[in-house]
A protein has these predicted regions:
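Short edge-strand/loop segments of extracellular domains
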Residues: 136, 178-185, 257-265
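Double-stranded beta-helix
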Residues: 170-239
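Active-site region of the double-stranded beta-helix
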Residues: 123-126, 148, 153, 163-174, ...
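Non-heme Fe(II)-dependent double-stranded beta-helix
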Residues: 2-37, 44-144, 150
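Phosphate/oxyanion-binding loops and surfaces in catalytic or ligand/nucleic-acid-binding neighborhoods
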Residues: 62-66, 123, 168, 184, ...
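Short, conserved beta-strand element in jelly-roll/cupin
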Residues: 152-170, 225-228, 233, 259-263
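Non-heme Fe(II)/2-oxoglutarate
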Residues: 2-20, 65, 69-73, 189-193, ...
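A short beta-loop-beta micro-motif enriched in histidine and acidic residues
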Residues: 113, 122, 146-158, 219, ...
């Protein structure tokens, strides 16, 4: 099964496998050492399958209600149509309501992930209230970038957790990371003081195609086929993106990004509270997923 980015096939010679970590057999220091060494932790089946299924079905039901999924909606097949704008006055309000589904929050802000990050930090952790739920239809992918410019305004002690709610085979656009990128000095120098909301003349997106980027750095593009309940954790300078969803069965990819930090660290008010306003202050309306499934995405 091919991996594509912007319709371009990734040469198999450039692809590598993500190293798996068994969190139940790892000490806190071993988890931190793996993050330091690889720039990520790949955790299989970390979330209870029943919790994942419940959240997925609840999200899919909402997408079906705006005519974006075919029946049976639990299969997650895109209809290629949408009544989202006809039925909802505000895209941001709609996506905020989807992102607030109780079964979803039991996963994203539940005890399992909180405990994982408490082990990583060596102290109690807390997840952002503002989450990045992504429903990804055919032809879409996330451009390569690192997260520092979005989330490190108040504290540098932030990690991203990417959770799969559907089967994410190679044709459905799994996450990838550039091998060793968390140690690329030029990346750290460029993004250490960058804030995408303040420095509007710059972009967080790395314009170089991942194929060229990996070749120039003699690196690999690391990925895997993800199962529901799998998670990938990585730091703010790990260069990553997603492959293109080009699945012939028209099934969407449902994943979610959650950020965690130590509870003792100061909190960025953009991402915490009852109604956080997100990176730019536009709330959930700023997210690509606030757009109907059949509409193109932006990049920043």
């Amino acid at each position: 099964m091919d991996t594509l980015i912007d319709k371009m096939k990734i040469p198999p010679s450039l692809l590598g496998k993500l190293n798996e970590t068994n969190i139940n057999k790892s000490t806190n220091s071993e988890l931190r050492n793996s993050l330091e060494k690889d720039g990520y932790l790949f955790l299989r089946n970390i979330i209870n399958p029943n919790e994942i299924e419940a959240a997925r079905n609840d999200v899919f039901k909402r997408l079906n209600e705006v005519n974006e999924l075919k029946e049976p909606y639990k299969d997650g097949i895109s209809s290629g149509k949408s009544n989202r704008d006809k039925m909802c006055d505000n895209r941001g309000d709609f996506w905020e309501s989807v992102s607030s589904i109780k079964s979803l929050r039991q996963v994203t802000n539940g005890k399992i992930l909180e405990n994982v990050f408490s082990k990583i930090f060596g102290s109690p952790s807390i997840g952002f209230d503002f989450i990045f739920l992504r429903a990804v239809a055919g032809g879409k992918f996330t451009h390569m970038h690192c997260d520092a410019g979005f989330f490190t305004r108040v504290t540098k002690q932030i990690f991203t957790c990417w959770v799969a709610f559907t089967e994410v085979t190679f044709d459905k656009g799994p996450l990838f990371v550039i091998e060793g990128s968390h140690k690329f000095k030029d990346v750290q120098d460029k993004y250490v003081d960058f804030d995408v909301d303040i420095h509007k003349d710059k972009k967080a997106t790395i314009d170089t195609h991942p194929i060229q980027y990996a070749e120039e750095r003699n690196s690999k593009i690391l990925t895997a086929e993800f199962k529901p309940g799998d998670a990938l954790i990585f730091g703010m300078y790990t260069v990553h993106g997603t492959f293109e969803n080009h699945a012939k069965d028209n099934k969407i990819r449902l994943t979610c990004d959650i950020r965690f930090q130590p509870k003792s660290e100061p909190k960025d008010p953009r991402y915490f509270g009852l109604k956080p306003l997100g990176t730019t202050g536009a709330g959930y309306g700023e997210l690509n997923s606030a757009r109907p499934l059949n509409e193109d995405w932006h990049s920043r």
